[in-house]
Curated annotation (Swiss-Prot):
CDD domains to which the protein is assigned, alphabetical: RNAP_archeal_A
NCBIfam families given in the database record: PRK08566.1, RNA_pol_rpoA1
Cell location: Cytoplasm
Record InterPro entries: DNA-dir_RpoC_beta_prime (IPR045867), RNA_pol_asu (IPR000722), RNA_pol_N (IPR006592), RNA_pol_Rpb1_1 (IPR007080), RNA_pol_Rpb1_3 (IPR007066), RNA_pol_Rpb1_4 (IPR007083), RNA_pol_Rpb1_5 (IPR007081), RNA_pol_Rpb1_clamp_domain (IPR044893)
One GO BP: DNA-templated transcription
Protein name from the UniProt record: DNA-directed RNA polymerase subunit Rpo1N
Cofactor(s) demanded: Mg(2+); Zn(2+)
A Pfam short name: RNA_pol_Rpb1_1
Species: Saccharolobus shibatae (strain ATCC 51178 / DSM 5389 / JCM 8931 / NBRC 15437 / B12) (Sulfolobus shibatae)
Length: 880
């Protein structure tokens, strides 16, 4: 057999002759089985169409089930029918060609000119050739008289899905598929080509079917259901319908039945052939099973998420995988995954026996499939597979093991596996972890690794895949392990880092008021898997105390320097240099934390140019992993010992504070009333480019926004800096000052589509307000807080604002998913070459430099090639 290189694939339309040639039999009978249950010859289950039973031989090719590819049959249609997939093309042909002579409705000179141009450009510039054919079609469709035979043209109408009508002088006439085929047969090959079709593979009359191909049985096998009844495939049901109606139509024509009956049967045949190709045609009732379920026909097999392309080619089901709920575990390493023992006993890794591992593997074989760590199978050098469930004496089998055997052993601690959470929106939605077999039934995941997976623990499930070859394991270790992906390729910052309790703990530990006795320091350092020397206590008398800053400094490299603002540096605690009384400017010199606190800006996830980022960048991702596995555990331990909780009193304000807020509310109400009065009196000054109504809305919104922020500032001013709700908001651990404002002071304006709520009843939002009322309360402003509780009208407006968020999320998800899929398909063949260019599969240059600057964000300094300031600081320090 000679080898050939595939240059390309060309799609065309099957001609009636080709359909007959590739067919092994004509399908003529609607009955499928005889009384004995044997398939009838000439039926849609004719044995010559392929083998679906094990052990049988195909009468056509002589092969058995595994090797018989299946063979086509054909149905000779009594009357032609339109192929529903080509209706648009048929419509174009009918409008662009003459009804009498079949020529394209442009002059001979133009045909010659356009043909010459088309043939010159079609190979080199296919898109230009397509534009030319579109122009020819549009020009030809406009012609009212044929330039070749002088015939006057009538208007053609398409009534979807497949009925064509011609508006003649005497009235509207329906064009039957026979009429259409007759017209299309007249179109010469040169004219077919100028309309953008290849006449050798796609003649227009082939779009009107006279012969229907019957697919092999192998793609529509019948299945035996529990009761022993044979259930046929949906395609088989559809083909039986087509054969039955075709036979009835033939009998009616032969018997000389009235034209009305023949036309009804012809329409029915057209319907069955159309729904055979696509059972979701708009305007056509779907063909249904006896149970009422719509049949899954050819188009449904191909399109959509479960279809052939996305369901079986782009994505496949795999072996050696498992799925269960995930639970948090801060005590395992960031690149470990806790695997339930039941899963570890089910999933296996093939390990080849060598002189160095033979004793270990013998013990695994003796343990067998039910005791972990054991083994499920042994594969002998001759390829024979031994299932250990059925081996009586496993010790004897273990003694016969020798180098060359392969043992499919259970997952054990340290094995490399792939972990994934759907939807997999970016590369690091799938990373490699090392196995830690644990009790329980859920996968355990370190909390720090949630952001790349976008995981939380409210019932999320994740998938685990076990690589089966040494190459796959090596690749996973080298490029997919979690700590090698701490820096995200999206923006060159750490996507894995502290969140929530970690940040709260870090802040409480590093704040300057935190002092620890030696015993307390030892207790929190006990969770770190490393020896720590704290040095001399910071306070010696009246009692020895270590500061929280000393504890953190013990984990930092001795040559590390950093300075920058903390997250708490805002509002009254804002500091822009080292002279900071509020502990909100971070200074680290020679690995010692001298000033400032650790919060979100220092160690938080998705925080580029943070302390964590520079530590990983300058001291390796291995060091980053070590830091997260040790120092971050200390933060959690500290917050556990310290206690960290929130109570109702944390968001309760005193009477004097409430009075201050109510005064602000009254002032804002007066201001809004004045604006409305000015508007009614015609004294309001419009904003340039806005109508008077829009200007009023803007002025009111500005006033109400100021009111909410003022109320928030008043509440914040009176909150204790160690109020835990406030600590969470200021450090960036969870929530924001706005959330506290809404809980303690007021909710503020509820908006829908960025505007105050307007819609509701005819002249008002709710029946609780007067018609044409545009006051803040009537348009969705909520003066209450969550602490005091919402009034009924306020609750309604709040629900309207919340509903918009839900709808928006659902719409955005589907749109972004579809957009991403299109981008992936378009960009999947591009790659960055060694010369720095980005090229397509054919070597075409897409970008002269990758990303126009040749910088890969993952290895950059937050997208910059080099951070010069940081390098200077490392070499010469910074000016104080």
């Amino acid at each position: 057999m000679s080898e050939k290189n595939i240059k390309g694939i060309k799609f065309g339309i099957l001609s009636p002759d080709e359909i007959r040639k590739m067919s092994v039999t004509a399908i003529i009978t609607p009955d499928v089985y005889d009384e004995d249950g044997t398939p009838i010859e000439g039926s849609v289950m004719d044995p010559r169409l392929g083998v679906i039973e094990p052990g049988q031989k195909c009468p056509t090719c002589g092969n058995t089930l595994g090797n018989c590819p299946g063979h086509f049959g054909h149905i000779e249609l009594v009357r032609p029918v339109i192929h529903v997939g080509f209706v648009k093309h048929v419509y174009e042909f009918l409008k662009a060609t003459c009804r009498r002579c079949g020529r394209v409705k442009i002059s001979e000179d133009e045909i010659e000119k356009y043909s010459r141009i088309y043939n010159a450009i079609k190979k080199r510039w296919p898109s230009a050739a397509r534009r030319l054919t579109e122009y020819v079609k549009k020009t030809a469709m406009k012609a009212q008289v044929c330039p070749h035979c002088g015939e006057k043209q009538f208007k053609i109408k398409l009534e979807k899905p497949y009925n064509f009508y011609e508006e003649r002088k005497e009235g509207v006439a329906k064009l039957t598929p026979s009429d259409i085929r007759e017209r299309l047969e007249k179109v010469p090959e040169s004219d077919v080509e100028i309309l953008g079709y290849d006449p050798t593979t796609s003649r227009p009359e082939w779009m009107i079917l006279t012969v229907l191909p019957v697919p092999p049985i192998t793609i529509r096998p019948s299945i035996m259901i529990e009761s022993g009844i044979r259930a046929e495939d949906d395609l088989t049901h559809k083909l039986v319908d087509i054969v039955r109606i075709n036979e009835r139509l033939k009998e009616s024509i032969d018997a000389g039945a009235p034209q009305l009956i023949i036309e009804d049967l012809w329409d029915l045949l057209q319907y069955h052939v159309a729904t055979y190709f696509d059972n979701e045609i708009p305007g056509l009732p779907p063909s249904k099973h006896r149970s009422g379920r719509p049949l899954r026909t050819l188009a449904q097999r191909l399109k959509g998420k479960e279809g052939r392309f996305r369901g079986n080619l782009s994505g496949k089901r795999v072996d050696f995988s498992s799925r269960t709920v995930i639970s948090p575990d801060p005590n395992i390493s960031i690149d470990e995954v806790g695997v339930p023992e039941i899963i570890a006993r089910t999933l296996t890794v093939p390990e080849r026996i060598t002189p160095w591992n033979i004793e270990k593997l013998r013990q695994f074989v003796i343990n067998g499939p039910d005791k972990w760590p054991g083994a499920n199978y042994v594969i002998r050098p001759d390829g024979r597979r031994i299932d250990l469930r059925y081996v009586k004496d496993r010790k004897e089998l273990a003694s016969t093991l020798a180098p060359g055997y392969v043992v499919e052993r259970h997952l054990t601690d340290g094995d490399v596996v792939l972990f994934n959470r759907q939807p997999s929106l970016h590369r690091i939605s799938m990373m490699a972890h090392r196995v830690r077999v644990l009790k329980g039934l859920t996968f355990r995941l370190n909390l720090l690794v949630c952001p790349p997976y976008n995981a939380d623990f409210d019932g999320d499930e994740m998938n685990l895949h076990v690589p089966q070859s040494e190459e796959a394991i090596a690749e996973a270790k080298e490029i997919m392990l979690v700590h090698k992906n701490i820096i995200t390729p999206r923006y060159g910052g750490p996507i894995i880092g502290a969140a929530q309790d970690y940040i709260s703990g870090a802040y409480l530990l590093t704040v300057k008021t935190t002092l620890l006795t030696k015993e307390e320091a030892q207790q929190i350092l006990g969770v770190a898997d490393v020896k720590i020397d704290l040095g001399e206590p910071a306070i010696l008398a009246p009692r020895e105390y270590y500061t929280g800053k000393q504890v953190v400094s013990a984990f930092l490299p001795k040559d590390f320097n950093f300075h920058g603002q903390a997250n708490v540096s805002s509002g009254p605690r804002l500091c822009k240099n080292e002279d900071c009384p509020h502990d909100s400017y971070v200074v680290i010199k020679n690995g010692i934390l001298l000033e400032g606190v650790f919060d979100k800006k220092a160690i938080g996830n998705q925080q580029p140019e943070s302390i964590l980022h520079w530590l990983i960048k300058e001291y390796s991702d291995e060091y980053g992993k070590w830091l997260m596995d040790n120092l971050f555990r200390v933060f959690i331990r500290f917050v556990e010992l310290q206690g960290f909780t929130m109570r109702l009193e944390d968001v309760s304000l005193g009477d004097d504070v409430k009075k201050e807020i109510y005064n602000e509310i009254d002032r804002a109400k007066v201001e809004v009333d004045n604006l409305i009065q000015k508007y009614k009196n015609g004294e309001l000054e419009p904003i340039p480019g806005r109508t008077l109504e829009e200007s009023l809305e803007n002025y009111i919104l500005d006033t109400l926004d100021k009111l909410r922020s003022t109320a928030g500032d008043i509440a914040s001013k009176y909150l204790d800096p160690f109020n835990f709700a406030y600590v969470m908001a200021r450090t960036g651990a969870r929530g924001s000052v706005l959330n506290i404002t809404q809980m303690a002071a007021m909710l503020g304006q509820q908006s829908v589509r960025g505007e105050r709520i307007k819609r509701g009843y005819m002249t008002r939002t709710l029946p609780h307000f007067k018609p044409y009322d545009i006051s803040p309360e009537a348009r969705g402003f909520i003066y209450s807080s969550f602490r005091t509780g919402l009034k009924p009208t306020e609750l309604f407006f709040h629900a309207a604002g919340g509903r918009e968020g839900l709808v928006d999320t659902a719409v955005r998800t589907s749109q972004s998913g579809y957009m991403q899929r299109r981008l992936i398909n378009a960009l999947s063949d591009l790659r960055a070459e060694y010369d720095g260019t980005v090229r397509s599969l054919y070597g075409e240059v897409i970008q002269v430099a990758y990303g126009d600057d040749g910088v890969f964000p993952m290895y950059s300094a937050h997208g910059k090639t080099v951070d010069v300031n940081r390098i200077f600081e490392r070499v010469v320090g910074w000016k104080t």
